Regions:
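A short helix/loop element that forms part of the nucleotide-sugar donor recognition site in Leloir-type
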Residues: 174-189, 344
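Short hydrophobic beta-strand element within catalytic cores of glycosyltransferases
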Residues: 296-299, 309
């Protein structure tokens, strides 16, 4: 059985790491995974470093790059024959899409070639009635969380959709002190500081400006030696706005913009506290990575965060955009180390039980095999 994973290639995020976890599991089965990229960039560099082969197919305009319906339709039609030919020539059985642009571009060429199309939805879908047409484009839908599952179009029958949690390598953990020394050396972090960390894309809806404001307010009232590291990349305009905010609030000596890092779990293991300030996360992959690495979590309440974190049991949640509640929850970590260790241990146990790569792969492969039978 040949399973094709097409990707744009312009970024590396949670969906890519989830598929790489699945890839490792599939390699030991009778399934042949094949990667296709449409851009040479961050993802191709990562695959090269892992010695994973991929095909490159140039696509000038992917469907969904523009929100205008006529342009989406034009891109689907324009790219149809090239992709349909590739699927037929390589005798692909299943196309597994993990990105909106990929799903819109590849789904019809796949279905009309006779291949099975699996639409892996990793973001909350809007309430637009146009999404009801997605049932014509895909054979099956997988959602990564309850909030994503509940946002799927109501006309998708239950027999054609499933909630499957993202996979993680729960066995791979780092020694905290070694990780901290490594991060200190790379980014010149003060050795004795309490290190708060954010890791993810630098985009507006991630609410990083709120985190910076909270950090600045706390440091002005506290004698603790705190440092904030922001790991990730975004467009220049937003990133520069964040840098200006840091300078405006007078905390530029206590905030490090680290850029992209290929080993997020190792970075997370160096944090004394990981902060996730968005309330709109469809899942929250970095939260689970922190749970595995025994790093305590402070996250905004809402979205996938509320599904992953049991407040006060496996992490702490604060009310979205409420600075006072943020500070209050942070103080609970700082002032009660014994209870913090209990939360860390609870979180680690939960992560290992719920998010193993093995159980994820079993669920996905079950869908693959069922597609061949039907």
């Amino acid at each position: 059985m040949k399973v094709l994973f097409p990707f744009v290639g312009d970024s590396v995020g949670g969906s890519h790491r989830s598929i790489l976890e699945l890839y490792d599991a599939l390699n030991s089965s009778a399934i042949t995974p094949i990667f296709v990229l449409h851009e040479i960039g961050p993802l191709s560099s990562l695959l090269d470093s892992l010695n994973i082969q991929y095909e490159y197919i140039f696509i000038k305009n992917l469907a969904g790059e523009s929100p205008y319906i006529p342009k989406i339709i034009f891109s689907i039609v324009f790219n149809f024959f090239k992709l349909n030919k590739f699927i037929r020539k390589n005798k692909i059985d299943i196309v597994h899409g993990n990105d909106l642009r990929i799903n819109l571009t590849w789904s019809l060429p796949a279905r009309l070639s006779g291949a099975f199309y699996l639409w892996h939805q990793r973001a909350v879908m809007s309430s637009s009635v146009l999404w009801k047409t997605s049932t014509l484009m895909a054979d099956y839908f997988v959602a990564i969380s309850e909030c994503v599952y509940n946002s799927l179009p109501s006309n998708i029958p239950k027999s054609k959709k499933k909630l499957i949690l993202n996979p993680f390598d729960t066995r791979k953990t780092y020694e905290i002190k070694d990780s901290r020394r490594w991060v200190n050396s790379i980014y010149s972090i003060p050795k004795n500081s309490i290190l708060l960390g954010y890791i993810g894309r630098l985009v507006d809806w991630k609410n990083i400006d709120f985190l910076i404001s909270c950090f600045a307010k706390y440091t002005k009232k506290s004698s603790l030696h705190l440092h904030l590291i922001i790991v990730g990349v975004g467009n220049d305009k937003y990133t520069n706005n964040l840098r200006r905010l840091v300078c405006k609030l007078g905390v530029n000596s206590m905030v490090t913009f680290a850029g992209f890092n290929y080993d997020p779990s190792r970075v997370i293991s160096a944090f004394d506290l990981m902060v996730a300030p968005s309330d709109k996360e469809p899942f929250g992959r970095t939260l689970v990575e922190a749970m595995i690495q025994n790093t305590p979590i402070l996250a905004a309440k809402g979205g996938g965060h509320s599904e992953i974190i049991d407040n006060g049991v496996s992490g702490r949640l604060y009310e979205h955009n409420n600075i006072d509640d943020f500070i209050s929850q942070f103080n609970l970590y700082i002032n009660n180390s014994k209870y913090t260790h209990k939360i860390i241990n609870n979180a680690n146990t939960i992560a290992k039980l719920k998010y193993s790569s093995h159980s994820h792969a079993e669920s996905i492969v079950c869908i693959y095999r069922q597609s061949i039978i039907t």
